[in-house]
Amino acid sequence: MGDVVPIVGSVRGFRWWRLSGAAELLSPWRGPVRWDPGENEASCLARRGMFGWKTSRAPHPNGCPSSRCECGFYALHGLPQLNDGLDRAIWEIDTASSGGRHGLVLGVAAGYGRVLIGTEGWRARFGKVLALFAGPLVTHHTRELGITAAAYNVPVYRDLDAFVQEWGPDRDELAELTA
């Protein structure tokens, strides 16, 4: 993450959410952090408490995210790739299983405000859910996913190519930001 380059607007990225069972999307790994419909503002969850992650006692001078911390809303520049090796990352889940028994759903988020761009993705102070994807053969959480999408006023795609074409990150913008 090199020099600070101001951009106007937002960046898009792919990310996973967990379906809550109550028409809510939760951050799947540092949770349960609920994403609201519309704008969400990140806070630093740098402290681990007895009952989960807690807000940091000392806010970062420049706000969330900080380059010296792991805070902020995360998203990937590209679709998660499967990797069966020992160095597998937690987000490397088969996209075809989105909305399946594990309760995770793939989507696209917009990030804006303070955004740190990395080689594989970004972290942002503000985030918004834009669209969701359910694997074409998935039937487990279909009703719940539809109710959740309606609550967030976002579309649900069953065709991965159409989902990426319509909502995926702008490749030209990414090339400039990661150069």
Predicted regions: what they are:
Residues 1-8, 102-105, 112, 151, ...:
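Low-complexity, intrinsically disordered short peptide segments enriched in small/polar/basic residues
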Residues 121-179:
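Active-site-proximal loop/hinge segments that shape catalytic or ion-binding/gating pockets
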Residues 1-70, 75, 83, 87-97, ...:
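ADP-ribose/NAD+-binding catalytic cleft of ART/PARP-like enzymes
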Residues 92-130, 134:
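Charge-dense polyanion-binding interfaces
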